[in-house]
Regions:
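Active-site beta3 strand of CheY-like receiver
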Residues: 49-55
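Charged docking surfaces used in two-component/phosphorelay signaling
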Residues: 20-28
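Receiver (REC) domain active-site loop signature in two-component systems and cognate sites
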Residues: 60
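Conserved acidic carboxylate
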Residues: 13
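Helix N-cap/capping motif at the beta->alpha junctions
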Residues: 35-44, 65
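Alpha4 helix (beta4-alpha4-beta5 surface) of REC/receiver domains from two-component response regulators
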Residues: 67, 90-107, 119-122
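Non-catalytic signal-transmission and effector/linker regions of two-component phosphorelay proteins
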Residues: 1-10, 115-134
Length: 134
């Protein structure tokens, strides 16, 4: 559990129960999780305290997840932070758009198994660590 202690993950989601659930799952694995209720709050949080990873919902009332993603990638402070989409948009075309057009690091459809989330996060963070310059 120790290696994850310093890993900050921001989860941007408009459903408080989902934030609580994901926080519980990831805290048990040693990750530090900060939840942001909605896109605008998430954008502010990520710019003030850039995390190691962003978990992002797509369907939020205040700021659409794709709009937020574009803003993150256009900002020098946040453009290199990996993003995993967690959404109820489960159509194959949505997944293709996310992974191959937008180039998000991973795309998880709700509902998901806790192990699926953990494996995705570990894969993305390991890939990021391996691609960082020495």
């Amino acid at each position: 559990m120790e290696p994850n202690k310093s890993r900050l993950i921001v989860y941007i989601e408009d459903d408080t129960e989902m934030i609580d659930l994901v926080t519980l799952i990831l805290n048990r694995r040693g990750y530090l999780v900060k939840g942001a209720h909605g896109g605008r709050q998430g954008l502010d949080l990520v710019q003030k305290e850039p995390p190691d990873l962003i978990l992002l919902d797509l369907m939020m009332p205040d700021l659409d997840g794709w709009d937020l993603y574009q803003q993150l990638k256009a900002n020098d402070t946040t453009k290199d932070i990996p993003v995993i989409i967690i959404t109820a948009k489960a159509q194959a075309i949505d997944r293709v758009l996310g992974l191959h057009i937008a180039k998000v690091e991973d795309y998880i459809s709700k509902p998901f198994r806790p192990q699926e989330l953990i494996e995705s996060i570990e894969k993305v963070l390991t890939s990021k660590k391996n691609s960082e310059p020495l």
